[in-house]
UniProtKB/Swiss-Prot annotation:
Primary localization: membrane
Protein name: Phospho-N-acetylmuramoyl-pentapeptide-transferase
UniProt KW keywords: Cell cycle, Cell division, Cell membrane, Cell shape, Cell wall biogenesis/degradation, Magnesium, Membrane, Metal-binding, Peptidoglycan synthesis, Transferase, Transmembrane, Transmembrane helix
Catalytic activity field: UDP-N-acetyl-alpha-D-muramoyl-L-alanyl-gamma-D-glutamyl-L-lysyl-D-alanyl-D-alanine + di-trans,octa-cis-undecaprenyl phosphate = Mur2Ac(oyl-L-Ala-gamma-D-Glu-L-Lys-D-Ala-D-Ala)-di-trans,octa-cis-undecaprenyl diphosphate + UMP
Pathway it works in: Cell wall biogenesis; peptidoglycan biosynthesis
Membrane topology: Multi-pass membrane protein
Any one GO BP annotation for this protein: regulation of cell shape
Organism annotation: Streptococcus pneumoniae (strain Taiwan19F-14)
Cellular location(s): Cell membrane
Function per UniProt: Catalyzes the initial step of the lipid cycle reactions in the biosynthesis of the cell wall peptidoglycan: transfers peptidoglycan precursor phospho-MurNAc-pentapeptide from UDP-MurNAc-pentapeptide onto the lipid carrier undecaprenyl phosphate, yielding undecaprenyl-pyrophosphoryl-MurNAc-pentapeptide, known as lipid I.
A Gene Ontology cellular-component term: plasma membrane
Gene behind this protein: mraY
Amino acid sequence: MFISISAGIVTFLLTLVGIPAFIQFYRKAQITGQQMHEDVKQHQAKAGTPTMGGLVFLIAAVVVSFLVALFSKQLTNNVGMILFILVLYGLVGFLDDFLKVFRKINEGLNPKQKLALQLLGGVIFYLFYERGGDMLSVFGYQVHLGIFYIIFALFWLVGFSNAVNLTDGIDGLASISVVISLSAYGVIAYVQGQMDILLVIFAMIGGLLGFFVFNHKPAKVFMGDVGSLALGGMLAAISMALHQEWTLLIIGIVYVFETTSVMMQVSYFKLTGGKRIFRMTPVHHHFELGGLSGKGNPWSEWKVDFFFWGVGLLASLLTFAILYLM
């Protein structure tokens, strides 16, 4: 535990120092910041804010995790594969951000390109990950999936990678939501005695807390796809490494809700010829524009943040109740 906490502190400090340096470099190089293409008027003031800040906490967490795991003899297959997903999905996000920021391609990678790269990473993860079988744990019951586990693994990794990406829409929301999710998995890893996984979790929590110092409203930097895609893939990989895949549906309810809102909105829009369920999706924008009902007073970003963080925290506590009390 001491080693894991120490790794978290080091990553926190590295990110705390690294982000200001990153922002300064961004400004001096006169790199065009985040472009705003949303209908939320108050977001237009954020145009030009440095993005790709996730690169800082990602590098810090990966390097610290690797070195500490190596010297403490905890560089297991679990650690290696979680770090692999972080690096690969981070690279996908970096390429997406790079095209948007430097090549001025608003779309970045097109959906097919992004999906292909994410699937490639998922296949490599599956081939090298030593699970010890293709069993899926569902509420304590073991379900043998056989060859179909690879389909599940790809769906899980790609799905949650993109889900966290959708959640990263207002200042601080994704960073602390993931801190809450990682903390929940930290408890599960500790109970299982998987200190190697706990090490990586603490390292990333430290990095995210250091990043949040500059990402809370008003954000001085955004994590970009390089951060959000990597974090979503990490959560999926950790749930698989702990053999508690189903828990991510509850622990990650915020990301599930965000993604489902987009799917519902698009489907309903097509079926009804232009009608909408929500004011705007992902659903955090719906709350921004008109509160819970979408027709009331607009919520501040802080209010939306605390609402979603609260939901994530309660969902984590519910997961513990199901796992350890029921």
